Amino acid sequence: MSDRVIRIATRKSALAMWQAEYVQAKLLEAHPQLKVELVPMSTQGDRILDTPLAKIGGKGLFIKELEVAMSEGRADIAVHSMKDVPVDFPAGFGLHCICERENPYDAFVSNTYASIEELPQGAIVGTSSLRRQCQIRSARPDLTIRDLRGNVNTRLAKLDDGQYDAIILAAAGLIRLEMQDRIKTYIEPTVSLPAVGQGAVGIECRNDDAELIELLKPLNHSDTESRVKAERAMNAKLNGGCQVPIGSYAVLNGDELYLRGLVGSPDGSVLLQAEKRGNVNDALSIGVDVAEQLLEKGAGDILQALYKD
């Protein structure tokens, strides 16, 4: 155990590398005798930059290659942004650690305007997320929403070039890259409910590697795990992928878990919402309950229409 080398599969983007280096540092902090190496690689989601994510389709656009590296023995663990992680894992693999969550809110970024409310009619807002698009369109149907792909720096450069009046990014990514000064406003969940698992980092590895799973335990953050578990249970019941207009956000207050869920039509004309409070030990059933409420309101029809496209 003392001289084991752990190889971390990671995407090459600055944010993905930050996450992998964070896990590397935490592992060495917990187990100073370990050797931890990074194995950077490109994924399908990184390579296809000229198409909106929702149109590429499929689940796991940003993680499949990392899983192949583990299955071929080139890596031992994969570090993921939890909002990119599908509900189901390949046979033999599982999520064995969720690290402490960063701010899970969406961030409003603009060089001219202070908030969504301040944007003038017809202003151009950049985001590729159907979840963000449907909620912004619902709040401000007079705005023009345009797709925005690329890593954080690329997106900010497009804003600075004047292609957009504002862009919406995950606050966590900007904070981790020490770019929080670009954030004009943190968008409240009542305006834009975050994505499932947004702001949390998860670690995937083989289910049969008992020694490695034990080594990961000190990195797990139980509060974050409970919250993300509820959000993912809702998503699983809805059979949602990463690129669908689904929002889910759990808050923990003592032993009480409060989960809000949302499914919207991409044009923002329909926003279905549901919520549930319960004991944190019932995180999974709370997630399922919120999903069932949404399905009763017609969420299945919205999602089915999207999957047909």
From Swiss-Prot:
Coiled-coil region(s): none
One of this protein's Pfam families, by short name? Porphobil_deam
**Which GO terms of the cellular component aspect does the record hold?**
cytoplasm
Q: What are the required cofactors?
A: dipyrromethane
Q: What is its EC number?
A: 2.5.1.61
Q: What class of enzyme is it?
A: transferase
Q: A single GO BP annotation from the record? A: protoporphyrinogen IX biosynthetic process
Q: Which residues carry this modification: S-(dipyrrolylmethanemethyl)cysteine?
A: 242
Origin superkingdom? Bacteria
What HAMAP family does the database record attribute to this sequence? Answer: Porphobil_deam (MF_00260)
**Physiological role:** Tetrapolymerization of the monopyrrole PBG into the hydroxymethylbilane pre-uroporphyrinogen in several discrete steps.
The UniProt entry's sequence similarity note says: Belongs to the HMBS family.
Q: What else is known?
A: The porphobilinogen subunits are added to the dipyrromethane group.
UniProt xrefs under NCBIfam families: hemC
Q: What is this protein called?
A: Porphobilinogen deaminase
Task: Record the organism.
Answer: Pseudoalteromonas atlantica (strain T6c / ATCC BAA-1087)
